[in-house]
Amino acid sequence: LSCESRSAVDWANFFGVSLSENNFQAQLPQSDDPDAGFVGSPDGLEGQLPPNSYGVHANPVAALLHHFGLNAQAVHGYSFDDLRKQIAAGHPVIVWVYGNIWYGVAPAQYTASDGHTATVVRYEHTVIITGYDDYAVTILDGAVAYSRSIPQFLSSWSTLGNMAVILH
C-alpha cells in the first residue's frame, strides 16, 4: 500500500531530488483520515476502506514533497486540460485513481474520528501521468509504464474527484 510514496519518490527524482521510498513513507503523518495522513499500514491488505489500511490522499503527499524542497501542490477537481498543460510543460503529474486505471465506480464517504468526511474508494491507487496523445495517456506505475485510453483514464481518475499533485 505504499504506491503514494513510490509515486512521490519517482516524481521527485524526475525533478532531480533523490528520496528514499521507505524514508518518505516513514515521514508521512499517520491518521484515520486519508486527507490528513496515511491510514493503516503499508503492509495491509489491498482493497480496504478506512479505518482499515488504505493509503493517503494528495494533501499530505504534496506537503511532504514541499518539505523536501519541491514546489508540489495538491489539487482537487483538476481538469484534463490543465493536466495536459502540465505534461506539455514537461511536468509529470501524480494522480489518484481506482485500481490500475480501471473504469470508475461510485466512491464511498468515510467520516474520520475528527468528524472530517473524506471520499474513498476500494483499491485507491496512485500513478504518474508522463504523456498523452489524442487517444491515450502514458502512465508510470512503479517500474512499469503503460497506456490507457483517455475515456478509461478519466473514468478512473474521476472516482476520487480528479485529485492530483502538480508542480506549481
What are these regions (language model features)?
Residues 19, 27-31, 35, 40, ...:
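Generic preference for flexible, low-structure residues
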Residues 93-95:
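A short, Trp-centered hydrophobic/proline-enriched beta-strand micro-motif
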Residues 103, 108-121, 126-168:
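Noncatalytic regulatory segments and standalone regulatory/sensor domains
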Residues 1-83, 88-91, 162-168:
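Cysteine-nucleophile protease catalytic domains, especially the papain-like/related folds used
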Residues 7, 76-79, 97-101, 131-133, ...:
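A mature extracytoplasmic/lumenal domain signature
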